[in-house]
């Protein structure tokens, strides 16, 4: 069934689903390709706005407001496609297709002990991110749920090399409740890489974590939290390297092998696998596959 015979409602559903599948850094490319197929500017613009809003939340798209980094997520969504930034005290809409802030408005915040703690935690987290990530961004948000105060720390770094046919994203999120003596930190680390020269190869790895932190004062909590994040992300990075190395040595040999016609020619799979190297950015944690011989076989 072609798109031309679908109802408008079905077209909207298909377009949005395809756009939401776009890997980080490739949303605009996916949108432009779909525009060539759909040829309905009004329909594409509306669906692009809706899907772009969700894409920003899913992949923590970074912005810069008044010289400060802002990470978009569902934690700072206000509704009506608007986001809120604690640091600049502004609310705004973001057009991902045009990479443009729109309808910027001031938005006040309550200055209490939790807000002061948020600022202290952000300072400690920035020191860690600046030391470990080449182009990293971080943000700390406040949220109140059923009269309980929470801090949400987000970290993001990416390298989108479309010209080299690969993109990579590392992000993590850490949430803890503001308690007097002890709090539990819930975290999630996520890595995604996409290589698309001759072969379409996706890697997605994530891990959920739970750790406890003692609270003495604001400065101690901020430093302990930053050390916890550093320790857990270092462990995750080491585990990713180990697991992917094992995968490249064993599992990928079976996954990537395909039935070929009988040519009476011996295919040296070991030589192919030896060219399937893992590339690691030590401070960032991106993992991608190098190509060369592999790409000559998978077409």
Swiss-Prot record:
Q: Tell me, what is one Gene Ontology molecular-function annotation carried by this entry?
A: actin filament binding
Phosphoprotein keyword on record = yes
Gene Ontology annotations of biological process type: actin filament organization; barbed-end actin filament capping; cytoplasm organization; spermatid development
Show the Pfam families listed in the entry: F-actin_cap_A
Keywords (A to Z) from UniProt:
Actin capping, Actin-binding, Phosphoprotein
**What's the superkingdom here?**
Eukaryota
Record PTM Phosphoserine, positions in chain: 290
Question: How is this protein annotated for GO cellular component?
Answer: cortical cytoskeleton; F-actin capping protein complex; membrane; sperm head
Could you tell me what this protein does? F-actin-capping proteins bind in a Ca(2+)-independent manner to the fast growing ends of actin filaments (barbed end) thereby blocking the exchange of subunits at these ends. Unlike other capping proteins (such as gelsolin and severin), these proteins do not sever actin filaments. May play a role in the morphogenesis of spermatid.
Q: How does it assemble?
A: Component of the F-actin capping complex, composed of a heterodimer of an alpha and a beta subunit. Component of the WASH complex, composed of F-actin-capping protein subunit alpha (CAPZA1, CAPZA2 or CAPZA3), F-actin-capping protein subunit beta (CAPZB), WASHC1, WASHC2, WASHC3, WASHC4 and WASHC5.
The similarity comment for this entry is: Belongs to the F-actin-capping protein alpha subunit family.
Report the protein name in the record: F-actin-capping protein subunit alpha-3
Gene coding for it: CAPZA3
